[in-house]
Curated annotation (Swiss-Prot):
Protein name, per record: 4-hydroxy-3-methylbut-2-enyl diphosphate reductase
Superkingdom to which the source organism belongs: Bacteria
Cofactor(s) of this protein: [4Fe-4S] cluster
The reaction(s) this protein catalyses: isopentenyl diphosphate + 2 oxidized [2Fe-2S]-[ferredoxin] + H2O = (2E)-4-hydroxy-3-methylbut-2-enyl diphosphate + 2 reduced [2Fe-2S]-[ferredoxin] + 2 H(+); dimethylallyl diphosphate + 2 oxidized [2Fe-2S]-[ferredoxin] + H2O = (2E)-4-hydroxy-3-methylbut-2-enyl diphosphate + 2 reduced [2Fe-2S]-[ferredoxin] + 2 H(+)
Binding of (2E)-4-hydroxy-3-methylbut-2-enyl diphosphate, residues: 55, 88, 138, 178, 236-238, 279
Amino acid sequence: MHNAIYTDLQKEVEVILARPRGFCAGVSRAIEIVKLAIEYYKDTKTIYVLHEIVHNKYIVETLKTMGVIFIDKVDQAQDGSVLIYSAHGVSKSIKQLAELRDLEVIDATCPLVNKVHKEVQLYDKSGYQVILIGHKGHREVEGTVGQISTPVIIVQNLNDIDKIEIFDPDKLAYVTQTTLSVDDTKVIIDKLKKKFPNIKGPDLKDICYATQNRQTTTKRLAELVDIVFILGSKNSSNSNRLKELAGIQTQAFLIDSYKEIDLNLLNDITKIGITAGASAPDILVQQVIDFLKQHMKVKLSDLEIVQESVTFNVPRQLRQYKEQYNPI
């Protein structure tokens, strides 16, 4: 799309980069797990990943070139191989299927998603009917619903609340997908609490820190610029939320790479905002900057709302290997 003819090297634009942006701790951990597994099992075992390790085309294609095989079903993995669960988590039934096979399983589920899984299990064990606020069909939602055998009610919007059939309003609890819009989720929670005053739940604590930070920064960024580009894949929930939030204030486009930028959109633009979803590597942001510099004068600046320092450890076996062979 970018091959539209537009180049004005005299035109100066300010490009404001959102901070934080891109990889969250859960995504960084999942990708590190796969890369360490490639080294650890080199020439000894085939490595399969169940579903996309994270929802980003660039990352998936890069890992494929390193020998990783992405599959949709456990039975596609050969006996004696390694199977890695994606950052979005999997259902208990999938884990049970894997246990029946001769597979070495590594769980790359984000610890914050695992936290929601434990909440669902605890509520169910205590006799509560569970509502999950999230998007039907999303891998994370499928994994969370699959933590218990009791049916989980999925609420995607306010209208869904009116259709809920409850057994006992005093034994009702909710959890949320970790990558939702904070603002939209708060409205849904408020309506649930109004309709079911005794409902239990974590408020907005299930929505991960990185999702909240990126949304807060993106909202502010959109107020300052004429257009926002969000680096992220179309199937990335958190990236789509960033596009929606930025779009409230200004033009917003979710792109996989600089190749999707239509330069004609920038004719009358003086300020461009750039951010990235939690699964998007920063190399994609740098490529956008380099591309813009080929067509106009670029003045770079940062918008930093909050600093992040969260990290998650990889599984012990890989951590020991890393410490032994990849000393920092």
